[in-house]
Amino acid sequence: MSEQLLKNVRVFREMVKRAGENPLNFREIVEKCGEMTDSDILLVSKKGKALQVYRDPARQSGLAPEWEQGVTLDEEKAAVLGGYVKTATNADLRICGVGSEENAGNNLLLSLETEKGRLGTLILCRSDRSYAEDELILAEMAALLLTKELALAIYEEDIREKKNNEIVRAAISTLSFSELAAIIHIFNELDGEEGLLIASKIADRVGITRSVIVNALRKFESAGVIESRSLGMKGTYIRILNPALRDELAKYKRGFQ
């Protein structure tokens, strides 16, 4: 093992040590890997979304110019990228929609996987030279760290989604039949995640009293599912706070159509 490789391995080790039980930062891992290997780096999710992008400031980028954090591949190209199940060297990144026309160059593609399946792909590329064995070791270490962090992020997101669903279900369970009907009609008319509604018009249309709508909104607001505010003659401002609300309400819509 070369002295430089050992030094870089210790950098990764120190990052893990410093993080302790807290999640590591995707950006820090990707940037360190890019600096250590003089590479452009792209971290892509399973669905083809760029989670992190690093461009080596010292050389012309091998990544297509449109690649920035949040950019997403189309399904066909994401499937091509997902077809690399083992570490690949010098793949044609243009086929995957990743590489630039001028500098497809030298590259490494590393699949980020757990026993539950693929989580994403780590891509390193540069135009001036091929990757040495020491650099491949560093890329594999970065991939290992990123796989761990992606798995943790996905797990935490699943926990948040389950909690949000439970909160919405609990809020719905407090509604009477007429209040549930009112809520469903309200959110059928709400355009997007927030907007203004006139409760009296909805009450007349549905055939319920305005107080039923007020009570239903109050229960949802108490549960932290929505924010509502009366604006007098203009109507009532409503904003959805819980992202699970619409999906849960959709399960009840058929009975009120």
Across the structure, where does each feature detected by a protein language model lie?
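Short strand-loop junctions, especially beta-strand C-caps/beta-turns
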Residues: 124-129, 188, 241-243
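Short, amphipathic alpha-helical interaction segments positioned at domain boundaries
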Residues: 243-257
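Structured interaction and signal-relay segments at domain junctions
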Residues: 2-10, 19-103
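Short coil/loop residues immediately preceding or within conserved phosphate-binding loops
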Residues: 38, 107, 235
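Sensory/regulatory domains in signal-transduction proteins
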Residues: 83-149, 153
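Juxtadomain coupling helices with adjacent low-complexity linkers
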Residues: 2-29, 120, 126-175
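Signal-transducing coiled-coil/dimerization helices and immediately adjacent hinge/linker segments
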Residues: 152-241
